[in-house]
């Protein structure tokens, strides 16, 4: 199970990234983190950019709402998602938590 921390209008969870993979994909829960594979190399921030773009498509939220809070130069990262402060944001948080719980 992937631990999700909820702060004021923010969800954070651990992410394990495997760069230079043959395709972008979710591997699943691994070592208390969501493990993903991405095709970009870990050079000049390209892996982080692709990681954010992949999570944006996976979670259905804008790239601007996703930040790498910790581990920008590491395979193990802490990703935070900024959500709107209204009821729609709470529904979005519940949807994302349910999606992550499925891994």
Swiss-Prot record:
Gene3D superfamilies: YggU-like. GO terms for cellular component: cytoplasm. PANTHER family: UPF0235 PROTEIN C15ORF40. It comes from Desulfosudis oleivorans (strain DSM 6200 / JCM 39069 / Hxd3) (Desulfococcus oleovorans). Transmembrane segments: none annotated. This is UPF0235 protein Dole_0289. Pfam families: DUF167. It comes from the Bacteria. HAMAP family: UPF0235. SUPFAM superfamilies: YggU-like. Belongs to the UPF0235 family.
């Amino acid at each position: 199970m992937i631990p999700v921390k909820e702060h004021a209008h923010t969800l954070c969870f651990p992410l394990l990234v495997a760069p230079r993979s043959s395709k972008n994909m979710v591997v699943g829960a691994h070592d208390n983190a969501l493990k993903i594979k991405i095709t970009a190399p870990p050079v000049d921030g390209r892996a982080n950019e692709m990681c954010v773009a992949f999570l944006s498509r996976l979670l259905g939220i804008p790239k601007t709402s996703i930040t790498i809070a910790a581990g920008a130069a590491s395979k193990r990262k802490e990703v935070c998602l900024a959500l709107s402060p209204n009821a729609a944001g709470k529904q979005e948080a519940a949807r994302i938590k349910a999606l992550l719980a499925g891994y």
